[in-house]
A protein has these predicted regions:
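Interfacial/capping segments of alpha-helical transmembrane domains
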Residues: 36, 47-90, 327-355, 369-377
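Juxtamembrane and boundary regions of transmembrane helices in multi-pass small-molecule transporters
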Residues: 23, 176-177, 201-281, 427-434, ...
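Alpha-helical membrane segments and immediately flanking helix-loop junctions
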Residues: 146-204, 291, 295, 375-462
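Intrinsically disordered, low-complexity non-transmembrane regions of multi-pass membrane transporters
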Residues: 1, 62, 88-90, 250-306, ...
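Hydrophobic core segments of alpha-helical transmembrane domains in multi-pass membrane transport
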Residues: 12-24, 38-51, 116-125, 193-205, ...
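Transmembrane helical segments that form the transport core of multi-pass membrane transport proteins
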Residues: 296, 304-398
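Structural signature of hydrophobic alpha-helical transmembrane segments
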Residues: 2-13, 111, 347-349, 410-419
Length: 468
């Protein structure tokens, strides 16, 4: 970590906070304690997660968090190997990764999408057993005590580390209708700044494959690398989301000191959508649902949900990549009428987004040679979604056309659902929990996308300094 990199990282953090401050709805009501402690918590997470080996040289126990994190990342790699067994049974050799004997190469539909199905089944089992509830509550306790945020918003944002933007608010179902505008913004931003576990596993799968292909390392090594980085990005995004939400929409109302909790009836731990949430604002509101009856039922229902998500991802990628190709072709034809020749392999839309967002890329520490390429990734993420952007990143990794530092920063910066289509997803997902506030959710949508994007850029800036 050089002094110039450190200074540029500090400039990036200041720039991100300045952008948020410029768009704040009540600049005089910003709680700078929350911002300061949130940034400190994010830095603590980053140092222990990303630089644990260096910390261990000073005092061995300081390396334990990193070791634990690496262990979890290793479980992801083992999980992907297990997914390959199921994929190969259905798809034959098409389901075998490039590093496996008998593989026919890399096929997205038979090697990546099955990951979503299996991970959804696994998460359903963990919720049924009550494991995830304990983990989420622990994370929420840390976030709430450090930042001074309310129980409901802390719990929802913490849940977003593991589940998607429409599932996480379900753990605070009884509170949603009564959330303040600032709390609602925090809940929405938490969804925008993070990704769901199922798609995270799929990113680990195909980014690791492409990285191994480009560098010659074992596929497991590439997957371990991206598992650690994507898990780190998800954890770091929680305090970052609250920081940016509280700057853009500061708290202006009195918030009761409520510890939000989600519990279950008859000790039946289920997914957040089927758990009973205990309201503590004077009224106990039990939400009772016929959830999974046993582990097998939980696995089956999770797999069914995962299949729907996998099919949705496949359809979305086909549509968006085709539309981007159409736009690139149309714009390319238009500029050629004026005698302009585009660089080989570069689309007009990619170049336009790259140039527009190049200053942002420079601000967060991307090497000068890659700022337009990174800008294209970021623009694609906001206009389309992060899955499309990650496929472009994977192609760039396989081609060896971007520097290692750019790969690291892009991995963190793209790790979130902050895109325009997510506004509609949140209206449809959070709106039914608070029908009277659907209009307010829609009104906050663009700000939530901005906050989520800035949160991802903040984690990317820190990662770029520590890992650059």
């Amino acid at each position: 970590m050089s002094v110039p990199d450190l200074l540029r990282g500090l400039l990036g953090l200041v720039g991100i906070l300045a952008i948020a401050f410029a768009f704040s709805s009540h600049r005089t009501r910003i709680n700078w304690r929350t911002v300061g402690f949130g940034l400190a918590l994010q830095l603590v997470f980053a140092v222990f997660i990303l630089k644990g080996e260096d910390m261990a040289t000073v005092f061995a126990p300081l390396g334990w968090p990193k070791a634990a994190f690496a262990f979890v990342a290793g479980l992801f790699v083992d999980f992907l190997a297990a997914v390959e067994v199921g994929s190969a049974f259905i798809f034959g050799n098409l389901g075998l990764g490039p590093a496996s004997e008998g593989s026919l190469g890399f096929f997205f539909f038979s090697q990546v999408l099955p990951t979503v199905v299996v991970f959804a089944a696994l998460m359903s089992i963990l919720y049924y057993l009550g494991v995830m509830q304990v983990v989420v509550r622990g994370m929420a306790w840390v976030v709430r005590r450090a930042l001074g945020t309310s129980g409901p918003e802390s719990l929802s944002v913490s849940a977003n580390i593991f589940v998607g933007q429409t599932e996480a608010p379900l753990v605070i179902k009884p509170y949603v209708e009564k959330l303040t505008r600032s709390e609602l913004m925090a809940v929405m931003t938490g969804g925008m700044a993070t990704i769901a576990g199922g798609v995270l596993a799929s990113y680990v799968a195909f980014l690791g494959e492409r990285y191994a292909q480009a560098t010659g390392v074992a596929v497991e090594v590439g997957q371990q690398l991206f598992a650690e980085q994507l898990l780190g990005a998800s954890v770091m995004a929680a305090p970052a989301a609250l920081i940016l939400a509280k700057i853009l929409i500061p708290e202006t109302e009195d918030v009761p000191d409520v510890d939000a909790r989600f519990t279950t009836d008859a000790n039946e731990a289920t997914l957040p959508s089927t758990a009973s949430d205990e309201a503590t604002a004077g009224v106990n509101a039990a939400v009772i649902d016929d959830g999974p009856k046993n582990v097998i039922d939980a696995a089956a229902s999770g797999a069914a949900d995962g299949m729907k998500l996998a099919l949705n991802i496949g359809a979305m990628l086909i549509a968006f990549l085709a539309l981007i190709a159409i736009i690139n072709g149309s714009l390319g034809w238009a500029v050629e009428l004026f005698g302009v020749t585009l660089p080989e392999g570069k689309g007009a839309l990619d170049l336009a987004l790259g140039f527009v967002l190049a200053p942002v890329a420079w601000l967060v520490g991307v090497p000068m040679a890659d700022i337009t390429t990174f800008g294209g990734f970021l623009g694609t993420k906001v206009i389309a979604n992060e899955f499309v952007a990650y496929t472009l990143l994977a192609d760039a990794i396989a081609a060896g056309s971007i520097q290692p530092k750019t790969i690291t920063i892009a991995t963190f910066a793209l790790c979130g659902f902050a895109n325009l289509s997510s506004i509609g997803i949140q209206i449809g997902g959070i709106g039914p929990l608070a029908p009277s506030r659907t209009g307010e959710i829609a009104a906050l949508g663009v700000r939530a996308v901005l906050a989520g994007t800035l949160a991802n850029l903040m984690t990317a800036t820190i990662a770029g300094v520590l890992l650059g």
